[in-house]
């Protein structure tokens, strides 16, 4: 018999997370590593688990994640987005609370490009009057 799996793709800045929810006891594996090992900071682990805690499904699913690109904070946001989308496929009735918390919204903020004549996106070279 085929196992029931729910897929979701999440994005944040330059990070892309492919999330798979499998019925289980609440383990989170990120790139084949435990979440404590992958994310050193507690705040990042909290971000990843927010949709599961909010919907009360923390102990119902094992979360298997492939994530690449960007930094750790962007990856945590992408995983949260992906888990939220996968939870919707598992149970559509969770949509109102996930939407109210803002977990289904793709954060549109991206890094601003560097402009020529400037040191960074907006930082101008030091101005000297004389």
From Swiss-Prot:
Task: Give one GO molecular function term.
Answer: structural constituent of ribosome
> Which family is annotated?
Belongs to the universal ribosomal protein uS9 family.
Give the record's keywords alphabetically. Ribonucleoprotein, Ribosomal protein
Give a GO cellular-component term. Answer: cytosolic small ribosomal subunit
Q: Where is the composition biased (Basic and acidic residues)?
A: 101-110
The name this protein carries in UniProt is: Small ribosomal subunit protein uS9
- Kindly give the InterPro entries that the UniProt entry links to this protein: Ribosomal_Su5_D2-typ_SF (IPR020568), Ribosomal_uS9 (IPR000754), Ribosomal_uS9_bac/plastid (IPR023035), Ribosomal_uS9_CS (IPR020574), Ribsml_uS5_D2-typ_fold_subgr (IPR014721)
Q: Which GO terms describe its biological process?
A: translation
What residue spans carry the region label Disordered? 101-130
| HAMAP family attached to this UniProt entry | Ribosomal_uS9_B
Q: Where is the composition biased (Basic residues)?
A: 111-130
């Amino acid at each position: 018999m085929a196992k029931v799996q729910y897929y979701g793709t999440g994005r944040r800045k330059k990070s892309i997370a492919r999330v798979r929810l499998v019925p289980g006891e609440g383990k989170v594996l990120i790139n084949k590593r435990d979440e404590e090992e992958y994310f050193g900071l507690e705040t990042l682990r909290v971000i990843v688990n927010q949709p599961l805690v909010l919907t009360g499904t923390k102990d119902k699913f094992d979360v298997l994640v492939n994530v690449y690109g960007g930094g750790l904070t962007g990856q945590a946001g992408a995983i949260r987005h992906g888990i939220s989308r996968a939870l919707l496929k598992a149970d559509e009735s969770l949509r109102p609370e996930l939407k109210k918390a803002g977990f289904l919204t793709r954060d549109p903020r991206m890094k601003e490009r560097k402009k020529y004549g400037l040191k960074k996106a907006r930082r101008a070279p030091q101005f000297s009057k004389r």
